[in-house]
Amino acid sequence: TAYRNKMEFTFGDAYKDGPLALGLHQKGSFYDILTVDGCEIIGADWSRILTATLAFFSGRNVPFFHRMRHEGILRNLVVRQSRANGQFLINLVTSTQWVTYGFDVKQLLQAFVEMLLELEKSDAFAGSIAGILYTENDALGDVVQSDRMELLYGQDYIEEEILGLKFKISPFSFFQTNTGGCEVLYEKARDYIMRGSVKLDGDKTVFDLYSGTGTIA
């Protein structure tokens, strides 16, 4: 069952010198990437975004960032979706080596945005795209971080709702990745408190500490 509201997909190859892949690390391998089209923990729209993005960059022969040689461009595609309204936040993460490989980054990013917006218009796409971002990351390690971030389209956040509370989630927000599971945990905690020895009234407040934005780490 699809439950994830955030995924960090990695660009790479499925085997040494193989074709471009976009997905998750294969079990037991730091370098080999498995394209996860049709993955059960994400929805169908996610797979459409993944497939379209892979085809876009494969067709233009844009190389992935090699983590041993520290050469290449494409690093990650970070996708978030709100369960409350179905909106997506899509963040393309690359190195800054575009010129080295002869690419016009501005032109290519504009084409990338146009491709995603055309995908959004298709009958098969059920959700909507709230924002598309571009992040530069020249860190040597295999971590998604931002040296510079640019908003390419729309807004730089999505909104989520848990038990009547609304949250604004930015590209690098720390937020529980299973919205439904988080809601169940809060309902259980609230139930235990209400049935326990400590009764809450209008003058009492429950604090959820040490958990990022306050939605269970």
Role assignments for model-derived ranges:
Residues T1-A217:
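Accessory RNA-recognition modules of RNA-modification enzymes
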